[in-house]
Amino acid sequence: MPGTNDFRSYVFDPARVDAAGKNVGQRVYWKLYAIENLVRVMAHSILTAQVGANWWAVAVDPGIQASVQRRRADYTNRPWHGTPGKHDIYYAFLSDLSKIIIANSHLFRPVIPDIDQWIARLEQVRLPRNIVGHMNWPHKTDRQRIDVVHADLQQLVQQLAASGTGLSIP
């Protein structure tokens, strides 16, 4: 929707709230969805190859494991809701994913030599992700940052696939 602006800059109008929500969803939210899930697939694939199928128990900080178990329990205790996924990685936040990659960067480096730059880039979208995830309007610079990280991550995934790195869905 070209010309849609943050509804909070105007006199209240429910139609503006709807338009702003549609704009953020169509322009930004889906890219964050893709970023987080591509990172999950890459982390799972690389750590499975480097550590083994039990990589979560071996390579993830116990604090993150405990947080994920609490989140998983929230869903288990409310079985009438859908769940994020079967693997624990789907219960990890973007900040958790970054910490997992940081702690295991030596295992990522053979496959993604510039992993430190990727960690920094994920950190650049963490706060804008929270803004969008909590249904607020991102700043133009944040939208551009998300656009660039999304496009570059798509390229990285294509490069990994072309290099023979097996990418598998957790």
Task: Label each region the model flagged.
Residues 1-170:
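Amphipathic alpha-helical interface elements
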